[in-house]
Amino acid sequence: MVLKFSVSILWIQLAWVSTQLLEQSPQFLSIQEGENLTVYCNSSSVFSSLQWYRQEPGEGPVLLVTVVTGGEVKKLKRLTFQFGDARKDSSLHITAAQTGDTGLYLCAG
């Protein structure tokens, strides 16, 4: 079975002073059930924290995790989230993807 994953680029408003761009890659991904996947989120700016969300079709985004400390790694079942040491990047790794993992994954800072 082919699973489809989507990631999105979010514009983030920090206070009301400037707009930061978070870039996620890949933007779209189709994999076979049981395969692993990694989604990356990068910025030129330092974030005090970073959040990952998952959105199912027709639903609002649901917070999966917040990472705060540079180098921090958090696990949620088969999902592993890592916040880069410099707090400018993060990754989401899904081990042995299942049909229930299908959705839109978003990072926000």
Swiss-Prot record:
Main location group = membrane
Disulfide partners: C41-C107
* Residue stretches making up the Ig-like domain: 20-109
GO terms (BP aspect) = adaptive immune response; defense response to Gram-positive bacterium; immune response; response to bacterium
What is its subcellular localisation?
A: Cell membrane
Cross-referenced InterPro entries: Ig-like_dom, Ig-like_dom_sf, Ig-like_fold, Ig_V-set, TCR_alpha_variable
Recorded superkingdom: Eukaryota
- Give the multimer and partner information: Alpha-beta TR is a heterodimer composed of an alpha and beta chain; disulfide-linked. The alpha-beta TR is associated with the transmembrane signaling CD3 coreceptor proteins to form the TR-CD3 (TcR or TCR). The assembly of alpha-beta TR heterodimers with CD3 occurs in the endoplasmic reticulum where a single alpha-beta TR heterodimer associates with one CD3D-CD3E heterodimer, one CD3G-CD3E heterodimer and one CD247 homodimer forming a stable octameric structure. CD3D-CD3E and CD3G-CD3E heterodimers preferentially associate with TR alpha and TR beta chains, respectively. (Microbial infection) Interacts with Staphylococcus aureus enterotoxin H/entH.
**What does it do?**
V region of the variable domain of T cell receptor (TR) alpha chain that participates in the antigen recognition. Alpha-beta T cell receptors are antigen specific receptors which are essential to the immune response and are present on the cell surface of T lymphocytes. Recognize peptide-major histocompatibility (MH) (pMH) complexes that are displayed by antigen presenting cells (APC), a prerequisite for efficient T cell adaptive immunity against pathogens.
Its name, as the record gives it, is: T cell receptor alpha variable 27
Q: Which organism is it from?
A: Homo sapiens
Q: Which gene encodes it?
A: TRAV27
